[in-house]
From Swiss-Prot:
The keyword Transport does not apply. The active site is at 192 (proton acceptor). It is an enzyme of class 1 (oxidoreductase). Substrate binds at residues 105, 137, 168, 247. Its EC number is 1.1.1.27. InterPro entries: L-lactate/malate_DH, L-lactate_DH, L-lactate_DH_AS, Lactate/malate_DH_C, Lactate/malate_DH_N, Lactate_DH/Glyco_Ohase_4_C, NAD(P)-bd_dom_sf. This is L-lactate dehydrogenase A chain. Pathway: Fermentation; pyruvate fermentation to lactate; (S)-lactate from pyruvate: step 1/1. It comes from the Eukaryota. PANTHER family: L-2-HYDROXYCARBOXYLATE DEHYDROGENASE (NAD(P)(+)), L-LACTATE DEHYDROGENASE A CHAIN. The lineage of its organism: Eukaryota, Metazoa, Chordata, Craniata, Vertebrata. Homotetramer. Keywords: Cytoplasm, NAD, Oxidoreductase. NAD(+) binds at residues 29-57, 98, 137.
Length: 331
C-alpha cells in the first residue's frame, strides 16, 4: 500500500464537478497578472485559468501563484491551450501589444486587432456563454472588435472603459478636498484615454453639487483650476509609464471591481464601454463608456445621464474619432 492509501480511505467515488464561477485571464503581462492577483485576493472565483502564447512566462507565473495556494481558496490553472479556459463565467482579455512611452492608445490598434483574431474565436469555442471583458488598449475599439469577432449579444461584451479613469478622477478630487474617493461622486465617460469626458455637472459630495457651489468648475474661467484634475487623469497613465515602464496595479484593481459586480450579481453602476449607437446623439456603431449596471447576465441596463450640451458634444467628437479608426480596420 502507498502512503496515500495508508492515510486515506475512500468513502465514495466523486463525480467531477464543474466550477460555478470560473474566471479566465488571457495574457500574463503586467496588467494580466495585476488583474489575476486582484481577483484572487478578493476571493471572487473558485477557479482561475490563465492563458498566454508565451509558454515559459505563463508556466512561471502559474507556478508562482500556485506556490501561494495555502493562502488562497482558488484553484489556479494555466496553459497555452485554450481548453484550460473551458466553461468560464467571465473571460478577461488583457493580451496585446504593450503601449510604448508616448504612444497613443489609438496607435496600438491594428497590431492588437490581429492578436484578437486568434484569441476571440478560441474563447468562444470553449466558453460560448461567458461574459467577455476587454481590457487591452485601445479598449473601446477592441471591445467593438471582440463584439464583432465573437458574435455575442452586446450585453455579454464589456470594455473596462473609463472605470479606471473615473477612479483616478475621484482620487484626485478627494486629494483636493481631503476626502476619501468613495465620498466624491464623479464620472468620466466617453473614450478611455485622451478624449475622455469629465462630467463636471454631476460631481457631488453627499448630494451637494460642486458646480452648484462653483459654477465655473471645469471651465477655463475657474480661478481654482479644477480643469487641471482632468488633465492629470488623462496624463496619469503616460506619467506612470514614463516612471515605471507600464501601468498595472490600478487597472488590475479596476478589473477585479468589475468582475466582482458580475460574479456577485451586485447590480452596481460602473462607467464601462458598451455599444452607444443611438445614445447622446451618437450615430455610428461605436463602443464608449457610459454608466452601466453590471450583474450575473453581464451588462443589464444603461443609466441615462443628464449631460450638458458641451459634454454631449465632446462625447460625439470621441465617437467620430473612434469611428474614423474603426472603419479602416480589417476584421
Amino acid at each position: 500500500m502507498s502512503t496515500k492509501e495508508k492515510l486515506i480511505s475512500h468513502v465514495m467515488k466523486e463525480e467531477p464537478v464543474g466550477s460555478r464561477n470560473k474566471v479566465t485571464v488571457v495574457g500574463v503581462g503586467m496588467v494580466g497578472m495585476a488583474s489575476a492577483i486582484s481577483i484572487l485576493l478578493k476571493d471572487l472565483c473558485d477557479e482561475l485559468a490563465m492563458v498566454d502564447v508565451m509558454e515559459d512566462k505563463l508556466k512561471g507565473e502559474v507556478m508562482d501563484l500556485q506556490h501561494g495556494s495555502l493562502f488562497l481558496k482558488t484553484k489556479i490553472v494555466g496553459d497555452k491551450d485554450y481548453s484550460v479556459t473551458a466553461n468560464s463565467k467571465v473571460v478577461v482579455v488583457t493580451a496585446g501589444a504593450r503601449q510604448q512611452e508616448g504612444e497613443s492608445r489609438l496607435n496600438l490598434v491594428q497590431r492588437n486587432v490581429n492578436i484578437f483574431k486568434f484569441i476571440i474565436p478560441n474563447i468562444v469555442k470553449y466558453s460560448p456563454n461567458c461574459i467577455l471583458m476587454v481590457v487591452s488598449n485601445p479598449v473601446d475599439i477592441l471591445t467593438y472588435v471582440a463584439w464583432k469577432l465573437s458574435g455575442f449579444p452586446r450585453h455579454r461584451v464589456i470594455g473596462s472603459g473609463t472605470n479606471l479613469d473615473s477612479a483616478r478622477f475621484r482620487h484626485l478630487i478627494g486629494e483636493k478636498l481631503h476626502l476619501h474617493p468613495s465620498s466624491c461622486h464623479a464620472w468620466i465617460v466617453g473614450e478611455h484615454g485622451d478624449s475622455s469626458v469629465p462630467v463636471w455637472s454631476g460631481v457631488n459630495v453627499a448630494g451637494v453639487s460642486l458646480q452648484g457651489l462653483n459654477p465655473q468648475m471645469g471651465t477655463e474661467g475657474d480661478g481654482e483650476n479644477w480643469k487641471a484634475i482632468h488633465k492629470e487623469v488623462v496624463d496619469g497613465a503616460y506619467e506612470v509609464i514614463k516612471l515605471k515602464g507600464y501601468t498595472s496595479w490600478a487597472i488590475g484593481m479596476s478589473v477585479a471591481d468589475l468582475v466582482e459586480s458580475i460574479i456577485k450579481n451586485m447590480h452596481k453602476v460602473h462607467p464601462v464601454s458598451t455599444l452607444v449607437q443611438g445614445m447622446h446623439g451618437v450615430k455610428d456603431e461605436v463602443f464608449l463608456s457610459v454608466p452601466c449596471v453590471l450583474g450575473n447576465s453581464g451588462l443589464t441596463d444603461v443609466i441615462h445621464m443628464t449631460l450638458k450640451a458641451e459634454e454631449e458634444k465632446q462625447l460625439q467628437k470621441s465617437a467620430e474619432t473612434l469611428w474614423g479608426v474603426q472603419k479602416e480596420l480589417t476584421l
